């Protein structure tokens, strides 16, 4: 299996925990094609959390890393609540800081209470709602 196929499988499996208003309609081959395009496109950056045989999670953002806009953060359901999401976010935060960014932002499904709680526990705050179903959450960086 390719990275794109593994990412597609993980996102499809984990998406059931998002409480989406509209479920994904993509098939695994369609998602794999989408991820093949993203992984080869210089406009996206993806950080993988993986072991010798498993992909545990991933985080993707636009190439303008300093903007801090996370497009996707998914953890394999078998490995949720083990700190992998927090580690991926800490890595992304460091990448944004290195590039001179001052915040990190993510859109969360309004019904995804687990994710809202997760981001809130990491000092993200709700800043707006868009498209009736996404909460924009942001964490501002403050220099000590």
Predicted regions: what they are:
Residues 75, 81-94, 117-121:
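Conserved acetyl-CoA-binding loop-helix of GNAT-fold acetyltransferases
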Residues 89, 96-107:
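Conserved GNAT acetyl-CoA-binding A-motif
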Residues 62-71, 80, 130-133:
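A conserved beta-turn-beta hairpin within the catalytic core of GNAT-like acetyltransferases
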Residues 36-42:
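Short loop/turn motifs at secondary-structure junctions and domain boundaries
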Residues 1-9, 128:
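A short beta-loop-alpha structural element at the N-terminal edge
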Residues 12-34:
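Conserved GNAT-fold acetyl-CoA-binding loop/helix
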Residues 102-144:
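C-terminal "cap" of GNAT-fold acetyltransferases
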Residues 48, 54-62, 69, 74:
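Conserved beta-strand in the GNAT
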């Amino acid at each position: 299996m390719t990275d794109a196929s593994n990412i597609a499988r993980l996102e499809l499996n984990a998406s059931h925990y998002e409480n989406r208003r509209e479920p994904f309609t993509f098939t695994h081959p369609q998602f794999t094609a989408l991820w093949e395009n993203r992984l080869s496109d210089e406009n996206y950056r993806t950080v993988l959390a993986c072991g010798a045989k498993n992909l545990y999670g991933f985080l993707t953002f636009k190439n303008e890393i300093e903007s801090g806009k996370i497009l996707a953060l998914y953890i394999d359901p078998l490995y949720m609540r083990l700190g992998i999401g927090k580690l991926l976010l800490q890595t992304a935060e460091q990448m944004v800081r290195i590039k001179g960014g001052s915040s990190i932002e993510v859109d969360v499904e309004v019904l995804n209470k687990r994710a809202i709680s997760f981001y809130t526990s990491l000092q993200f705050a709700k800043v707006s709602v868009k498209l009736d179903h996404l909460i924009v959450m942001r964490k501002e960086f403050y220099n000590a």
